[in-house]
From Swiss-Prot:
Tissue expression remark: Expressed in both leaf and hypocotyl tissues.
Role this protein plays: Bifunctional enzyme involved in flavonoid metabolism.
Keyword Acetylation in record: no
InterPro entries per the UniProt record, alphabetical: Epimerase_deHydtase (IPR001509), NAD(P)-bd_dom_sf (IPR036291), NAD(P)_dehydrat-like (IPR050425)
Reactions performed catalytically: a (2R,3S,4S)-leucoanthocyanidin + NADP(+) = a (2R,3R)-dihydroflavonol + NADPH + H(+); (2S)-flavan-4-ol + NADP(+) = (2S)-flavanone + NADPH + H(+)
Protein name per UniProt: Dihydroflavonol 4-reductase
GO BP annotation list: anthocyanin-containing compound biosynthetic process
């Protein structure tokens, strides 16, 4: 296993009057970001699909300072101008939400175009408000490395191959396309409107969470335990808290511009499996993975640009899994042991995950690209 850094974030304090807007505020990434912003003293406008649905927003309303510093707004990426009201008075925007539907019969019109239109609609709303100085967009590692000839190193100059994606149409292809086109369109449109545009590119996001449902990115990360084997031959990882701290850091940093990869660790599946077996022996985790070479080369997503402006990651890969496992246990989304079935000599069966407790595929779903690696969607 390899890591980029382990330290603390040197964060800046925002002006007391700073108001920011977070799209997708009720989701896995969005809700943690809202929590950290409130802790910093920001006033937060968070848009969600249905502010009246207490089951979906309860975790936000219970956050410290939510009663004084948090306002929830109803908005829809597919509806032009639906963000105009929520953005009033905001100095910054964190665009986390994205439409996702891997089973769409018409991905071009149901996923790709709405994502791009939604991005441009947000920039238009920013321009109308005339108060927004910076927009931070949660992109995806799927914009970096989906290509026929895989490399061992990727940085912010890397872009996935659209022609290859359209030709192969691998699982999640419409998500990759939507993120690539939205990011590129936003760069140009933000420049025209004199808005600082920053995109932050996470790999698989793992860690504790405050949502009530099982984040699909953790279905991927914990597949070693649950036996929902979307096997990550080798993967790149970031702790949810590090990712959200990086969002705020980049928003506050006066010299931040352009794309930033936010990836702290990379590891092959055998190393991750060994760690989980050692730290959580109560779970049955395979020692062999058919068809996966133990000497598989590591692919690195470089966070050098982010660290060069003094951001430092503070969480280890073990921290990520500890936070995820403990939270899932607390919320009764994961059993405390899977040893009984395995110890009886039977093939391990997948742990049933209730659809009641599973965030829909439209929210933060893990996506396998053509090499068996995974990235995450965000909402």
């Amino acid at each position: 296993m390899a890591s980029e850094a382990h330290a603390v974030v040197d964060a800046h304090s925002p002006p007391k009057t700073t108001t920011v807007w977070v799209t997708g505020g009720a989701g896995f990434i969005g809700s943690w970001l809202v929590m950290r912003l409130l802790e910093r003293g920001y006033n937060v406008h968070a848009t969600v699909r249905d502010p009246e649905n207490q089951k979906k927003v309860k975790h936000l309303l219970e956050l410290p300072k939510a009663d004084t510093n948090l306002t929830l707004w109803k908005a829809d990426l597919a509806v032009e101008g639906s963000f105009d009201e929520a953005i009033q008075g905001c100095q910054g925007v964190f665009h986390v939400a994205t439409p996702m539907d891997f089973e769409s019969k018409d991905p071009e019109n149901e996923v790709i175009k709405p994502t791009v239109r939604g991005m441009l609609s947000i920039i238009e709303s920013c321009a109308k408000a005339n108060t927004v100085k910076r927009l931070v967009f949660t992109s995806s590692a799927g914009t970096l490395d989906v290509q026929e000839d895989q490399k061992l190193f990727y940085d912010e100059t890397s872009w996935s191959d659209l022609d290859f994606i359209y030709a192969k149409k691998m699982t999640g292809w419409m998500y990759f396309v939507s993120k690539i086109l939205a990011e590129k369109a936003a760069m140009e449109e933000a420049r025209k409107n004199n808005i600082d545009f920053i995109s932050i590119i996470p790999p698989l996001v793992v860690g504790p969470f405050i949502t009530s449902t099982f984040p699909p990115s953790l279905i991927t990360a914990l597949s070693l335990i649950t036996a929902h084997y979307g096997i990550i031959k080798q993967g790149q990882y970031v702790h949810l808290d590090d990712l959200c701290e990086a969002h705020i850091f980049l928003y506050e940093h006066p010299k931040a511009e352009g794309r930033f990869i936010c990836s702290s660790h990379h590891a092959i599946i055998y190393d991750v499996a060994k760690m989980v077996r050692q730290k959580w022996p109560e779970y049955y985790v395979p020692t062999e993975f058919k068809g996966i070479d133990k000497d598989l080369a590591l692919v690195s997503f470089s966070s050098k640009k982010l660290m060069d402006i003094k951001f430092q990651f503070k969480h280890t890969l073990e921290d990520m899994y500890k936070g995820a496992i403990e939270t899932c246990r607390q919320k009764q989304l994961l059993p405390f042991s899977t040893r009984s079935t395995a110890d009886n000599g039977k093939d391990k069966e997948a742990i049933p995950i209730s659809t009641e407790n599973y965030s829909s595929g439209k929210e933060n779903a893990p996506v396998a690209n053509c090499t068996g690696k995974f990235t995450n969607g965000e909402i």
